[in-house]
Structures are given as structure tokens and as C-alpha cells.
Curated annotation (Swiss-Prot):
Residues covered by region (LDL and other lipoprotein receptors binding): 157-167
Main subcellular location of this protein, as a coarse class: secreted
Function: APOE is an apolipoprotein, a protein associating with lipid particles, that mainly functions in lipoprotein-mediated lipid transport between organs via the plasma and interstitial fluids. APOE is a core component of plasma lipoproteins and is involved in their production, conversion and clearance. Apolipoproteins are amphipathic molecules that interact both with lipids of the lipoprotein particle core and the aqueous environment of the plasma.
Residue ranges of the region described as 8 X 22 AA approximate tandem repeats: 79-251
Region named Specificity for association with VLDL: 274-286
One term of GO molecular function: phospholipid binding
Protein name: Apolipoprotein E
Gene Ontology biological process terms in this record: acylglycerol homeostasis; cholesterol efflux; cholesterol metabolic process; chylomicron remnant clearance; high-density lipoprotein particle assembly; intermediate-density lipoprotein particle clearance; lipoprotein biosynthetic process; melanosome organization
Record carries keyword Signal: yes
Family: Belongs to the apolipoprotein A1/A4/E family.
Amino acid sequence: MKVLWVALVITLLAGCQAEVEPEPEPEVQLGREWPGWQGSQPWEQALGRFWDYLRWVQTLSDQVQEELLSTQVIQELTVLMDETMKEVKAYREELEEQLGPIAQETQARVSKELQAAQARLASDMEDVRSRLAQYRSEVQAVMGQTTDELRGRLASHLRKLRKRLLRDAEDLQKRLAVYRAGAVEGSERSVSAIRERLGPLMEKGRGRAGTLASQTLRERAEAWHQKLRGRVEEMGTQARDHLEEIREQLEEVRAKVEEQGSQIRLQAEAFQARLKSWFEPLVEDMQRQWAGLVEKVQLAMATSSTSAPSENH
């Protein structure tokens, strides 16, 4: 299969590199229908939009054509060109990712020729845009004079450019088809290689499964028992460690509570001492005043009792 692939690529590249002699073209009136472009890939559809837009410009009347060429046609063709080349590049990169391992020399040659075909297509589209821009400049230069000669020259140039564009687009299409075939073949080889590598592993897995199935129920039960016992012992150890950790935390809390109780007791005693130091002098002073008052009352009563008998005599 690999030999057929290499032969196909070499044959196609040799045919694409052959010199193509330009054929004389029949005179075609401006605006006459010319073949469209069809394809299913995104880049082919983008090129078809460029092709259809250029054909639509060709079918316009002279006055409308001149007005459009002076404003929007060049810009819209530029957008369509960029879109086409972007899709071509994306499709080529996608194929390069899918391309399997082939001969290094053949792969490099295919890639080089494909890039050259892509560059020729871009050059053809750029020539179309440049020719339309030149026609617009020449129309503006004649300042209202007859433009029949200019339109004739434009039609002749566009016929040649259309033919070259179609030829290079078909060339690129063929090369991408070859590239695509190589990518599919590479994918198939990759799947086969993976299958070959997985085969021994699958056989080994089936053999291991058979070995496990042949073990006695007692051996498997013993294995599960050992595993379960180890798990229970592990859980018991974890539980003991957790309980020890809780006990240590409770001891720390109790020590902190006792420490805080001692601090509160010391603070209460200090506060009591401060209260005593505040009120003790006041109490002593009140006691002295009370003793003096009692003494004065007693003295007054004694004086009153001695003076009363004297008055009776």
C-alpha cells in the first residue's frame, strides 16, 4: 500500500510540473457566461464565491460596472481573496495533522509542491484585483472619453486570468486530494499499529483474568479477610489517636480554666483589699465621731442630773 501511495504521488507531481502551452482563446464578449466553480470543501466554496462575484461584475452594464469599480468591487474582491486563502491554509494544515508517517523525502516534496500551488492561486487572484484596479485608474484618466477600448482590453485580460485561475485552482484541488488520500492512509496505518500494540496487552489481560478466575474461593476469602482485618486495625489505630488527641485538648482546656480561675480569684482579692483600703479610714473616722458624740451626750446628761437637786433646796 505504501509503494502504491508513493507511486501515485510521484506520478501526479510529475504531471503537474509539466509545462502547459497556452492555447489561443476565442473572443468572448464582456458579460457572457463562463464556467463556474464547484466544490464541497470550505476553501473550494470560498473560491466559488470569488468566482461568482467576478462573473456577476462581468454581467453588469457599462455604467454600473464603472461605478462599482470605483467604489466597492476592489474591496469586496480583497475580502473574498483573503477568505479563500484562509480556508486553503486551514484545510492544508488540517491534512498535515492527519497525514501519517510516510517517506520523509516524499512528504517534503508533496508539502513543497502544495505550497507552490497555493501561492500560484493567490497570485492569480491578486492579478485579477490588480487588473480591475488598473482599469478603474484608466477609466478615471480618460475624463469622460470613450472607454470601449479599455473595456475590450479588460475583457481580454480577464479571459486570460480566468483561464489561468481555473487551471491553478484545479491543480491545487488535485494536490489536496492526493494529500487527503495520504492522510487517510496514514490514519489507517496508525490504527493498525495501535491494534498490533494492544493485541499482546489484551492477550495478557485475558490470561491474567483467567488466572484470577481459577483461584479457589477460600484463597480469595482469605485475601479479603486479611484486607478487612488490616483496614479494621487501621481504623482502630486512627480512633485511638483521635481519642488521645481529644484527651490532650481537654487537658489543655482544663488547665486554661484553672489558670483563669486563679487569675479571677487573685483579681477579686486585690479588689477586696482596695475596697478595704478605701472604706477602713472612713469607718474609723465615723467610729471616732460616734464615740465623741456619745461622750458629749453622756456628759450633758450628767450635768443635767447634778443641777436638778440644787434647785429643789
